[in-house]
Amino acid sequence: MKNVNYMKTNRKRKGSLLKQGFITSVMADYSFEQVVDFASENGFECLEVACWPKGKAERKYAGVTHIDVSTLDSFKAEEILRYCKDRKVTISALAYYPNVLDEDDECRKKSIDHLMQVINAAAELKVNMVTTFIGRNQNLNVSDNLALAEKIWKPILNYAENRGVKIAIENCPMLFTEDEWPGGKNLAISPAIWRELFKRLPSDMLGLNFDPSHFIWQEMDYIKPLYEFKDKIFHVHYKDIKVNKDARNDVGILATPLSYMLPCIPGHGDVDWSEYIRVLLETGYLSLIHISEPT
C-alpha cells in the first residue's frame, strides 16, 4: 500500500495505556473507509483525520480531505461514527494545519473560515479536538506575531469554547526551505513563546499537539517541557528527526533546516523514545499518540 508500508504491523490490541494511531494525510489516495479499515486491520486504535478543504494542496500532505466538513451533517456524522465503532477505531482529532496569520488577507480569511467549519465538525462528531497551527506572518518578528495571534485567535477560541472543542497547536516551525524563510509559518515553536501565547490567550481549550522531533534540529530539550506544560498537552505526535552533523558543520544552523536534517519515522532518528514515553506517562498523559508524516 503506497506511503503506508512502514506503518503495517501485526500488533494486537492489548489495552495499552497509550492508544496508537496516525494522521490520515499519509494515505491521501484512499477513502476515509479504506483508512479506517487499514487502521483496524493493523492494530491502530485511533486516527487524526485530515480535513483540508477540497482542492489543490499548497504543500505536501496538505489538501487531504478524508472528512468533508463543508457538507457534514448529523446523518453523515452518525454514519462516520458507526463505521469507526464497528471497527474499534476512534477519531482522536480533526486535523487542519493552515496559516491563519498569513500576510495575505484573502488566504487568511479562507483559512479561518474553514477552521471554523472544522471546529463545528469536531463538535458534531463528538471528537471535541482540532489539531492545527497557530500560524505566523513569516516577515514579522516574534513580538508583532504575538500581537497578531492574540487578535486573530481570540474570536476563534471563543467560537471553539462555545462548542466545547479543544484546539491543539503543533510546535512545527514550518521552516524547512527558502519558501518559508525567514521566520517560518508557525509561531508556536518554543516554551518561551508558548508561555506568552497562553498568557495572552488564557483559554482552557487551547493547548499543544506535542511533537518532539522539531526540538531535535533546533537543539532544544524536548523532555523538560513535558513537565512544565503537562496540563496543556492535549495531543501527541510520533515523528523522528535525524541530524546530519557533518552537513550542519558545513552549512551552519542558520541554513534552511532540510539542508542538514531529515524527518523520519520513529526509531530512525535522534529522539529517545523510551525516555519520551516514560515522561509522558509520569506526567499523567494517558491518551493518544500518533505517527505523523515523515515529510
Regions found by a protein language model. Give the residues of each.
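Active-site beta-loop-alpha junctions enriched in small/polar residues
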Residues: 23-27, 50-54, 96-99, 135-137, ...
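N-terminal pre-domain/capping segments
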Residues: 2-128, 143, 147-154, 161, ...
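Short glycine/proline-rich, acidic loop/turn segments that cap or connect secondary-structure elements
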Residues: 275-288
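Conserved beta-strand positions in the central sheet of alpha/beta enzyme cores
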Residues: 48, 93-95, 131, 168, ...
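Active-site groove signature of glycoside hydrolases
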Residues: 122-142, 168-178
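Acidic/histidine-rich catalytic cores of soluble enzymes
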Residues: 18-20, 30, 144, 150-270, ...
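Conserved small/polar residues in nucleotide/adenosyl-binding loops
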Residues: 289-295
